[in-house]
């Protein structure tokens, strides 16, 4: 399926502007035109932060920004889907054009700026799937013009508490001015304190404890990673997602669009994000869940993330270039890898290559 998409489907979609093509793909999922049969393998199931995932492969936030097609994404084979980023009030994001394909690099640069329809629209959609099976997480953010950005994250926790299976606190988008400053130790302490307090208050009212993950940037120094790891441990955070898009343009082949402002995702992000993942694993130890994101476009790259220290992995840009058959292809490859490695579960392969990845040098 992914091979057919690369020769025919992608060619057709790429005749459209990137944002139009994205809209068409959402429509295709809504109408049921896009379907894929995917394998189920008990050896791929993994328990993370109290949740049992049927497999470790998830759809990253940014694709289904407004919670329109989470169940359709699960039907493609994803073990979980993350909607958002959602802000309390609707916002249009940055001016177009704001998504740029780098085809030779199998990459994308975006400067969308948290464009979304806001909490209310997503709440109505997610309410319609209440009670359905499948793990759907909610990625929460802050409005660009918010006077108290942390209050926006707290509002997201409270609004979606009964509907989200987990939350991701996104403070690492490079496209909202000043947002990444929340990764600094003092700001992060206040953010996590208030967010986790809201989570605990909501949980006490309904006896459900929703995990909260923190999504970080790949452009952090070792000292910044130290601070985040220490704060995550002190606050008893449920997990860390490594990583968001990068500001680095290292190693790009495609001169066209490479100088555009925004975050780079796709194949060129794989090395950097995997090194940062492994370094974070060394800092947080074996018990804290880590979710690896960045450059996953095959079973090999998904497995590399797991061996570098990821409990779960997510992709997005790989789907743009490989098509809706990619999740099934990755899951089949992971099942084969489990047999080849002589283990009974994908979880047994975690951390096999952490030291080697953490020791790699990053090029700015």
From Swiss-Prot:
Subcellular location(s) of the protein: Cell membrane
Cofactor(s) needed: FMN
Binding of FMN, residues: 61-65, 85, 139, 170, 215, 243, 266, 295, 316-317
Cofactor comment text: Binds 1 FMN per subunit.
Binding residue positions for substrate: 65, 110-114, 170, 175, 244-245
Membrane topology term: Peripheral membrane protein
Pfam families hit by this protein: DHO_dh
Gene Ontology molecular function: dihydroorotate dehydrogenase (quinone) activity
EC number: 1.3.5.2
InterPro entries according to UniProt: Aldolase_TIM, DHO_dehydrogenase, Dihydroorotate_DH_2, Dihydroorotate_DH_cat, Dihydroorotate_DH_CS
Entry's Gene Ontology cellular component terms: cytoplasm; plasma membrane
Family: Belongs to the dihydroorotate dehydrogenase family. Type 2 subfamily.
Function text: Catalyzes the conversion of dihydroorotate to orotate with quinone as electron acceptor.
Protein name per the record: Dihydroorotate dehydrogenase (quinone)
Organism: Brucella abortus (strain 2308)
């Amino acid at each position: 399926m992914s091979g057919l998409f690369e020769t025919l489907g992608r060619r057709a979609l790429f005749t459209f502007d990137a944002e139009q093509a994205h809209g068409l793909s959402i429509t295709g999922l809504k109408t049921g035109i896009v379907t894929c049969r995917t394998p189920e393998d008990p050896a791929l199931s993994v328990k993370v932060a109290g949740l049992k995932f049927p497999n470790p492969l998830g759809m990253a936030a940014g694709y289904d920004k407004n919670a329109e097609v989470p169940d359709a994404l699960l039907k493609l084979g994803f073990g979980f889907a993350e909607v958002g980023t959602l802000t309390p009030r609707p916002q249009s994001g940055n001016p177009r054009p704001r998504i740029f394909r780098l085809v030779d690099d199998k990459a994308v640069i975006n400067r969308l700026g948290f464009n979304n329809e806001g909490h209310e629209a997503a709440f109505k959609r997610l309410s319609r799937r209440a009670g359905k099976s499948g793990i759907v997480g909610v990625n929460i953010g802050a409005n660009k013009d918010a006077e108290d950005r942390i209050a926006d994250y707290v509002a997201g926790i409270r609004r979606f508490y009964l509907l989200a299976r987990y939350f991701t606190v996104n403070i690492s988008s490079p496209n909202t001015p000043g947002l990444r400053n929340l990764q600094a130790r003092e700001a992060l302490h206040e953010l996590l304190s208030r967010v986790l307090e809201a989570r605990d208050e909501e949980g006490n009212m309904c006896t459900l404890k929703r995990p909260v993950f923190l999504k970080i940037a790949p452009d952090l120094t070792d000292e910044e990673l130290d601070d985040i790891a220490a704060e995550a441990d002190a606050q008893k955070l449920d997990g860390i997602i490594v990583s968001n898009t990068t500001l680095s343009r290292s190693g790009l082949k495609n001169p066209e669009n490479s100088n555009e402002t925004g975050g780079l995702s796709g194949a060129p992000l794989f090395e950097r994000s995997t090194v940062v993942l492994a370094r974070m694993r060394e800092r947080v130890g074996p018990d804290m869940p880590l979710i690896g994101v960045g450059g996953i476009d095959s079973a090999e790259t998904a497995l590399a993330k797991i061996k570098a220290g990821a409990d779960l992995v997510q992709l997005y840009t790989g789907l743009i270039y490989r098509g809706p058959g990619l999740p099934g292809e990755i899951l089949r490859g992971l099942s084969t890898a489990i047999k080849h490695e002589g283990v009974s579960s994908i979880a047994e392969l975690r951390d096999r290559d952490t030291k080697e990845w953490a020791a790699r040098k990053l090029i700015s």
